[in-house]
Regions:
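Short, cationic, amphipathic peptide segments
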Residues: 1-23
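Short, charged, amphipathic alpha-helical segments
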Residues: 58-66, 88, 114-119
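Long, amphipathic, charge-rich alpha-helical segments that form helical bundles/coiled-coils
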Residues: 71-114
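C-terminal amphipathic alpha-helix
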Residues: 105-135
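Amphipathic, membrane-active segments
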Residues: 16-70
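Long, hydrophobic, amphipathic alpha-helical segments used as structural scaffolds
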Residues: 23, 41-44, 48-55, 76-86, ...
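Small-residue hotspots
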Residues: 34, 41, 48, 94-95, ...
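Mid-sequence acidic-hydrophobic segments that form the walls
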Residues: 11, 15-18, 97, 104, ...
Length: 135
């Protein structure tokens, strides 16, 4: 269950590593990718903040699933269909953020798991900003 945070971070790191490739795409595709990456970042930030405050991030599961389902359609031209599906599946495997919140709250490693979520959020946000402007 706690591999969820690692999966999310792995997706963010992989996509961030493709920054040059992603920002080379045409403007509308970059805008679509940036919007999705920013939405993912916002979801992760809200999830982490909720967990840190001792709350269960209700509704974030459905939100993250929606983004995971949209991801392959947004990045497949840049990474290939198989890899796009794999990344979408990895993000989708993290759907149980409400259960994650309950597990993390009881964990002695709570801060390290939250740090992974926050790092992933930061990478998604930075990538969104970089590809939006083509930098």
């Amino acid at each position: 269950m706690l591999d969820i945070t690692k999966n999310i971070l792995d997706v963010a790191r992989f996509l961030f590593g493709l920054n040059d490739q992603l920002k080379a795409t045409e403007r509308q595709r970059r805008a679509d990718m940036a919007a999705l990456f920013e939405d993912i970042s916002n979801c992760l930030t809200a999830t982490s903040g909720g967990i840190r405050a001792g709350a269960i991030p209700h509704g974030r599961c459905a939100e993250l699933i929606t983004y995971a389902q949209a991801l392959p359609g947004v990045i497949y031209q840049e990474v290939g269909e198989a890899r796009a599906r794999e990344l979408g599946d990895m993000l989708h495997s993290a759907y149980a953020v409400e259960q994650l919140a309950m597990r993390i709250a009881q964990s002695t490693d709570k801060e390290s798991y939250l740090a992974q979520l926050e790092e992933a959020s930061g990478k998604f946000r930075a990538l969104a900003n970089l590809i939006r402007v083509g930098l």
